[in-house]
Regions:
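Short glycine/serine/threonine-rich phosphate/pyrophosphate-binding segments
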Residues: 16-18, 92-97, 117-125, 151-153, ...
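Structural signal for conserved beta-strand scaffold positions within catalytic alpha/beta enzyme cores
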Residues: 54, 85, 113, 133, ...
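Class I S-adenosyl-L-methionine
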Residues: 1-15, 20-114, 217-218
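Short, acidic/small-residue loops that bind anionic groups at enzyme active sites
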Residues: 102-123, 134-141
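Short, charged, surface-exposed secondary-structure boundary motifs
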Residues: 61-67, 122-124, 152-153, 205-208
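A contiguous loop/helix-start segment that scaffolds small-molecule binding in enzyme catalytic cores
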Residues: 2-5, 78-83, 96, 139, ...
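Acidic/glycine-enriched edge-of-secondary-structure segments
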Residues: 51-65, 136-146, 168-169
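A short alpha->loop->secondary-structure connector
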Residues: 105-108, 131, 186-192
Length: 240
């Protein structure tokens, strides 16, 4: 009998931000394959005796290859196991979800996707600001600041990213933001555009700082911490 895979979004780190459905799947799973940022308190909800397998990827450290992760997921499911693939934030955002779904489809293994709180939503909630504003911030855009090499992705839509009326959230962008900021300014975005750096979102060491895109670029050029972070810039990226 073939098993089943639940892609479970773990949220940004605070276990109280898990959905009820996420907790239910963890409590019934035979195996949990978890990302680096999905470990810790979230895993306390896993069923006692379940296999807990770390498959996370972090910039600057050795990580499992994606093909290995997909193969492991298929192998567990083919034993008939109920498998949770635990992904940080919302698993549909920058989580390489499609590649793992493709592997399951090729093996005729069923799956479901359980949404969760993305770190962008958790960050603005912690900062006490909204993502949108009537008339002046009508659009939200998410972009990754790193490709598979760790550099800034090619082919970015700079006209969209330099829109002064949008709220832009940059995931995994600390290492490349100095370059991105210069590109934004070259495309007409004011260096005084408000920006927010949110590190360790919804964890005990959470830190939120306010900048402009120019001052944030300078700040990050001086050195960065190893904590996961996101960057938000636009008209709402300032302390109310």
């Amino acid at each position: 009998m073939t098993g089943f895979v639940s892609f479970v979004s773990s949220g940004p780190g605070d276990p109280e931000l898990l959905t009820l459905k996420a907790v239910a799947r963890l409590q019934s799973a035979d195996a949990v394959l978890f990302d680096d940022l999905s470990s810790g308190p979230v895993l306390t909800h896993a069923r006692q005796g379940a296999d807990l397998v770390g498959v996370g990827k972090r910039a600057g450290r050795a990580s499992p290859k994606q093909d290995h992760v997909s193969r492991l997921l298929v192998d567990y499911a083919l034993t008939g196991a109920k498998v949770v693939r635990l992904k940080s934030g919302d698993c549909s955002l920058f989580g390489r979800l499609e590649e793992e779904i493709t592997a399951l489809n090729a093996a005729s293994i069923g799956y479901e996707i359980i949404p969760g709180v993305t770190s962008a939503s958790a960050a603005v909630a912690a900062a006490g600001i909204p993502l949108t504003r009537r008339l002046t911030a009508r659009r939200v855009q998410f972009v990754t600041g790193a490709d598979v090499t760790g550099g800034l992705p090619d082919g970015l839509n700079m006209a969209a990213l330099a829109d002064p009326g949008a709220t832009t959230v940059v995931y995994m962008g600390k290492r490349t933001f100095a370059v991105l900021a210069q590109m934004l300014m070259d495309h007409g975005l004011s260096p005084d555009t408000p920006a927010m750096l949110a590190e360790g979102v919804s964890t005990p060491d959470q830190q939120i700082e306010w900048f402009t895109i120019a001052s944030l670029a300078a700040h990050l050029a001086d050195g960065i911490s190893t904590r996961p972070a996101l960057i938000l810039y636009g008209p709402l990226a300032q302390d109310l």
